[in-house]
Amino acid sequence: MARRDNDFYLDHNANGEPNINGAIFLDAAIGLDSRPYTYLLYGHNMKTGAMFGSLRNYENSAFYRKDPFITFDTMYEKGRFVVFAAGVVSTEESSDKYVDFYALKSRNIQGRQQAIDSLIGASTHSCEIDVEPEDQLLVLVTCVDKEEDRRVVAARRIRDGESEAALKKQVKRSW
């Protein structure tokens, strides 16, 4: 789902009807008319595991090693991504776990690299998957207990010529 603001789908479903669960939605600043550097998706952290309630599973190394890939298709293209970071980050600039989500959406290479490094630094586990600022990212974001904290799962698009089998071996060595 996409809209001009990031609040509507917090309490409306995909059909636009009021719903306490909301919907998973694309950041309002990201358009689908061109290929964005980053798909930034938000959803509620439901205790039932619905919406993005299951993102916490990626912080479990056994879960991640079993299937480190995410499929994300748009109406324009199919996408396969490999997870490189999962953990809790902060939107508070003074925090040591701060991630600049605006930089992830930017074309500024230095800012993107800093944001990628912050995601990797806040990850629950270290990972051997390399990530370049030119890579297309998929970042799934949900809330946690503290208002300024967010649970994230960050993945990069699998590059042309890369094999999922080789990437999975890298994952098994590191997590």
Tell me the role of every PLM-derived stretch.
Residues M1-W175:
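Solvent-exposed, non-transmembrane regions of membrane-associated and secreted proteins
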